[in-house]
Every structure is written in structure tokens, then in C-alpha cells.
Amino acid sequence: MFKIYAVSDSIGETAEQVANATAYQFGSSVKVERVPYVKTFEDVNNLISIIKNPNEAMIISTIVLVDIREFLVQRCVESGIHISNVLGPCISLVSTILNKTPEYKPGAVWDMDKKYYKKIEAMEFAIRYDDSKDHSGIKHADIVLIGLSRTSKTPLSIYLANKGIKALNIPLMPEVPVPEELFEIDRKKIIGLTIDPMHLIEIRRHRVDNMMKIPTELKYANAERVLDELEFADKIMRKLKCKVIDVTKRAIEDTALIIMESVFSDRII
């Protein structure tokens, strides 16, 4: 059986994907074997020694390290082994077009994968601790959003999760005790969300109408109730000494940008 060796100086996922896509075109007559972390001349020699018959194998390489890549090509030529270097020509072409020297960093795709999984983890975190009654996540959150109902806490948590940021949100209500954990974490992580009372009343009444709960004077959308809640939330935010953002008619993206600039002012997201 013909074998394709997917060789890389990182985990080899890109090389294996290319090899699998190639092998797929030839059914069961081609087998793929991943050979990761080829970073030394010795690693190259060990690989070459495995291939006994050059007519029954080839190498697909995504090695970025120049000296190792060139040595592998040299050894393949000496041994009569066919090799396809996937990244080399692409890197060279882009380098020529941009007139810029590449950094030759192995594992770029793996770094992208890590970012992807970080987003997934942040998304799961946001969903788990949405309007959280479970306060155990407060100490593990990158950002804690606090505010009244209908102040965009949930959509902000989801938006931030898409940036790989673990955001937890806690609703503030006069009848519900404020979690003690809020007073035990870095205040910089806490973001208070406030809103114009008339705008909040309008949003809540619209919500009530959609839920077909009449009359709109229902406590949830009652003007006096809303003012009481806003006063309560303001007291809590002042007590926490946290940053407060007015979300009145502000887009989620704009609010999120302010939050990220505030919390991560010392680093780039």
C-alpha cells in the first residue's frame, strides 16, 4: 500500500489534512501517517530511515523552519523519495509580493485552533452563567456585567464570548441579595450597565406586550418600579466603585468596545 507521510515541525494537522484530501482521491489504496515535531536533523534522518521503498511512499511537508525544510528536501533527493512542500512556495510567493521577510513560525494553525477553542470555552461560560444564580463563576470570569433586566447583559456576554472573553452577568434586583463574591474580585473586572429610565420603561413595555401580558402597568414595566430599580443599581455600583456604562440607544458593539478598552487597557484583545 502506498503511504503518504504528513510531516511537520508542529503538530502536523495542516499536513495531515492535505494528505487526507489527497489520499481520498485514490480510495483505500493510499494510507496517511502523521509525523509531527520534526525539528532537528536527527528527526529528519529518522524519518528517511523509515521509508524503505521510495516507490511506495511520499512526504507532504508543512515544515516552516528553513534549515530543517532544506535538509529534508536534500535527504529526500538523496534517497529518491518524492516530497511536496505545501507551505514553502506559498510563503515565498507572499514574501515576494509584500517584499517582506516571513517570520517562519511553526504551529500557526495550532495557534488559530487555540483561539477557536478559547471562543468555544468562553461561549459555554457565558451560557452557563447567564443571569447567574450560580456565583461560583465570578472569580473565574474575565468580565462581570451587572445591571437591571433589559440592559443588554446577555447579548454583551455572548458578543464578548465571541472574542474569547469569559463574561458573566448578574441581574440587580432590590429583592435579591448582591453576591458577596463581587466584593472579593478586582473592581476593574466589574462593569455596571445603566440606562435612561424612560427608554427602559419603553423596552420593558414592549417586552410585556410581546409576552401578551396586559396591562402594561404590570410591575415589571411600571415607571415607579423602574426608578426604584435604577436607584438600587446605582447604589450598588457606587459601592463597588466599578466603571458604569450608559447603554441607552447604544449598539452592542460600541458598548463591548468600551468594556474591552476599560478592562484590558493594558493589553490588546
From Swiss-Prot:
This is Putative pyruvate, phosphate dikinase regulatory protein. One of its GO terms (molecular function) is ADP binding. PANTHER family: PYRUVATE, PHOSPHATE DIKINASE REGULATORY PROTEIN 1, CHLOROPLASTIC. It catalyses: N(tele)-phospho-L-histidyl/L-threonyl-[pyruvate, phosphate dikinase] + ADP = N(tele)-phospho-L-histidyl/O-phospho-L-threonyl-[pyruvate, phosphate dikinase] + AMP + H(+); N(tele)-phospho-L-histidyl/O-phospho-L-threonyl-[pyruvate, phosphate dikinase] + phosphate + H(+) = N(tele)-phospho-L-histidyl/L-threonyl-[pyruvate, phosphate dikinase] + diphosphate. Signal peptide: none annotated. Bifunctional serine/threonine kinase and phosphorylase involved in the regulation of the pyruvate, phosphate dikinase (PPDK) by catalyzing its phosphorylation/dephosphorylation. It is an enzyme of class 2 (transferase). Belongs to the pyruvate, phosphate/water dikinase regulatory protein family. PDRP subfamily. Its EC number is 2.7.11.32, 2.7.4.27. Keywords: Kinase, Nucleotide-binding, Serine/threonine-protein kinase, Transferase.
